[in-house]
Amino acid sequence: MIRTPRHSVITSFLSRTKDRFHEYNEPKTLAERLRMVAAMEGIDGVEAVFPYEVGEASEFRQAMDANGLRVAAINVNVKAEPEFRNGGLTSTDAAVRAKAVRFIKEAKDYAHAVGGDKVTCCPLGDGYEFNFHCDYGEAWRHLVETLGEAGSHRPEIPLFVEYKPSETRGRCFVDNAAKALCLLNDIGVPEMGITLDFGHSMYGNENPAEVVSLLAASPYDYYVHINDNDGRWDWDYMVATRHFLDYVEFLYYLQETGYDDYLTSDTSPTRWDIKGTFEANARVTNRIWEKLGALDRDRFRRLIAARDYLATWRFVEKEILAL
């Protein structure tokens, strides 16, 4: 029997957010956000952003316990400081790089203090916009050195690197799964992993299900963010709203590879009810998950292995789409 997945929410999306044109939702304290998550059906975890949203470790842990919640991950922000604007981990200034490394190390210490088992980091400020904008080799060496130093600190709390094609930079240095794996191979710290965000993979022109297989075959762990978009930008829509069958295949391969960590909603409820948005993510995901778990898996595997797609499509029509 395949266990129903565990769900968590990134706390940033539970309060006021903004884009270039509008602000959305009302600001909330961390305590209010945690109470909101506790009231969400099917969700029992949070990914909290360090150092801006968490407060003292003892107070955070007490609030989590009071609401019956668990820490899915601590998300360390290495882009928001003014000196990180042009890159923190890859800055040409050694002092700036050292500060970014310190942020990650302190996030690991914080995760340990609050009962978390991982830190995830998306180095969005590290990238470039133009031809001849930077020395690519130097930037890569800085990534290897800085993330390697941070990853080696407190190895019992693994550091997961999240890749993304762009934003805040025109092109992020760590912009796809293959490059993220190359980075970890160069770093050589076994207690590291990769955060796979479904939407980042989609608008990066990857197939998220294929990426799951790639990461599962690697020596590194992986951790999952769920959402959707139009394939052109990281809109962070609700799951399966734009890429239904891609999401179904993604969940199928999570099952096939034995993924048993949190599915964390990295979803932005701008114009939609916050609680309803995240409950929809959990509800739809669980229903698809259960549907996949009830399939004749041996038959489905044989069909996929035979590569006769018309036969496979008939199976999908009947058993998954119920057409």
Language model features with spans:
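Histidine-acidic metal/acid-base catalytic patches
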Residues: M1-G42, D109, D117, G148, ...
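Active-site acidic/histidine proton-transfer and metal-coordination neighborhood
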Residues: R3, E83-G193, R314-A322
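Glycine-rich, proline-tolerant flexible connector loops at the mouths of alpha/beta enzymes
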Residues: D44-D65, P123, G127-N131
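Conserved beta-strand positions in the central sheet of alpha/beta enzyme cores
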Residues: G45-E47, A73, T120, F160, ...
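Residues that line or immediately flank small-molecule/substrate-binding pockets and catalytic motifs
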Residues: F50-E53, V78, P123, D228, ...
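Anion (oxyanion) recognition and catalysis
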Residues: D65, H112, Q255
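Short glycine-enriched loops at secondary-structure junctions
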Residues: I74-A80
